[in-house]
Amino acid sequence: MCVRLRRRDFLFLAAAAAVLRGEDRPKRDMLSRSVRPEDLEMPLSGFSDYLTPAEHFFVRAHVYVPTVNLSEWRLNVGGSVASPLALTLDDLKRLPAAELVSVLECAGNGRAFFEPPVPGLQWGHGAVGNARWRGVRLADVLKRAGLKASAREILLDGADVPLGSMPDFQRSLPLEKALDPNTLLAYDMNGEALPVKHGFPLRVVAPGWAGDSWTKWLTSIRVLDQEHDGFWMKSAYRHPGRPVAPGVAVPLDRMRPVTNLRVKSVIASPLDGAQLDPGSPTMIRGMAWGADPVAAVDVSIDGGRVWKPASLIASQRTRFGWRQWEFAWTPQQASYFTILARARDAAGNTQPLDQEWNQSGYLWNAVQRVHVNVGSAVPKPAIPEQAYASQRPPAAFNNCLLCHNDDVIRQQRLTRAQWTAEINKMTGWGARIDDAGRDALLDYFDRLRP
């Protein structure tokens, strides 16, 4: 029997099939931080949604998005276990399901604000999102495999393939975090199959921890009886854990892995440089989050001299999700104002006015400052744009631009010594740059500095 479908029915079925396959909706109005691999930041307008839609959710990828054939995909569980497993997605969905709302934030969110500047993607405020995650508890999968008494860490690996001789992106979780009932292996995001760019078909959800522990495209769980010493644990995603003088590098062996997020808030409205009218009611709005639940947000409109409590949206009270806050203000006189928002969590941690510096640019949580102009015809002075050199040496075309787009390079504000360290890292991963090419690159990077 032949059934004729109307066009709208066909489009509906095609869209439904795409959801089941975890296909991505187009990312709109996002800020590009890298084209190859693709890294996208959510603009401040995205902080108006309690649950961040997938099409507005930030994207962080160290390598290119892998192609996953679901019929062949398996989650392999091995190492220090009694019964190694090879689970299909259907196998996982037959286990008891768990669901929670949690913020996912890149460890480097806010890196662009560090002074002195530090290398890496120059994220502003938007390498973060809040979603409803559904899947199975990692603890249930480990229980099914049978942990041996020697188990110490859980090594996580995905289907993504390293570029050149770059080390495979593997992260480990301590046993305590892995067995936490809130740590999930998620297959759904906001009620739909995980989009490909967000880890389809399976990703780790480690609530309260930075995104480097939220492994995407998960294919392997290996139970270790000793601490994992791979590059992405011992050399990357580490920070001092204590105050250091700005510009002072700390040896890797004196740093520790990034784990818990820090309490912070973002002012989404009004925007920096906004023009307001005297006597016009203005609602100051934003989001606040951290590893612990947000307890309060205070707002100042005079640069931090006087603070007043903002209102938290009561319906958004969850253990790991962010909280929207708002503060009503009616400016009475023409002037420039500096608006600040400061969050406090249930553990008593308060957002600092000034940021502790670290060489990797991780865990930025200093109070944001938004400058608005009330009633004056004179606009707030614009920050001059950097003047970029137009001539790139061959070494840039043959090495840097094979993986990174030009904007990523232009966003950096590094010293010659910092660029030298970055080139050394790339040559260690297989980039071929002779001495003349190295000097040409360093001279070019010097010209990029404002």
Could you tell me what each predicted segment is?
Residues T420-R432:
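Short microdomains enriched in Cys/His and/or Lys/Arg
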